[in-house]
Amino acid sequence: MNIAKYIDHTLLKADATKQDIKKICDEAREQGFYSVCVNGANVAYAHSLLTGTDVKVAAVVGFPLGAMTTEAKVFETSDVIAKGAQEIDMVINIAALKEGNDAEIIKDIKAVVDIANGKAIVKVIIEACLLSQEEKIRACQLAKEAGAHFVKTSTGFSTGGATVEDIKLMRETVGPEIGVKGSGGIRDLKTALAMIEAGATRIGASASVSIVNDEKDNTAGY
């Protein structure tokens, strides 16, 4: 397995400088990561560094709370796509989900999917650590119904990250048709492989270089 191709090499800290963004883009190029995942303000710079490579640029939208209006998420999506984003990782309106407002959730996701249509794929972050089992299932069902290309466990900025149990549940819920991304707290090869075995088709990580080096060490001599 080439674990690098599963990885969105991620840097979403508020104090990430241009130098930091250049570092993750250089690493992504060298290691062959699937993408880099950055905040909107860093999309244009990351795109300029990765043009002509296979590495995609993913941008977060409505991040990390998901608690802005749909119109704001749509504008943000349109803006980052114009600046070079090929993937969108958006956060759902978690309160609307907890209130049972399924129509609002679908409207919110579908608006982003529609504006991204043909230009970027959309991953929907459900922030699983804040949800009950029933809410996790419903969030995944609604994301799939709204046309999302992936469901994603976590922002990495809340009370918990990805778990194998959540990945299994999410994969069982959405079936084979769309992707499942584990993100938050995946810092070593063993954890990354456990997520993939449970059904993840993408991994979000900041410790990506360490994960890939673990894989190289494990296969050395074979």
From Swiss-Prot:
Its main location: cytoplasm. GO terms for biological process: 2-deoxyribose 1-phosphate catabolic process; carbohydrate catabolic process; deoxyribonucleotide catabolic process. Pfam families: DeoC (PF01791). The keyword Cytoplasm applies. The active site is at D89, K152, K181. Its EC number is 4.1.2.4. It comes from the Bacteria. One of its GO terms (cellular component) is cytoplasm. GO terms for molecular function: deoxyribose-phosphate aldolase activity. Catalyzes a reversible aldol reaction between acetaldehyde and D-glyceraldehyde 3-phosphate to generate 2-deoxy-D-ribose 5-phosphate. NCBIfam families: deoC (TIGR00126). This is Deoxyribose-phosphate aldolase.
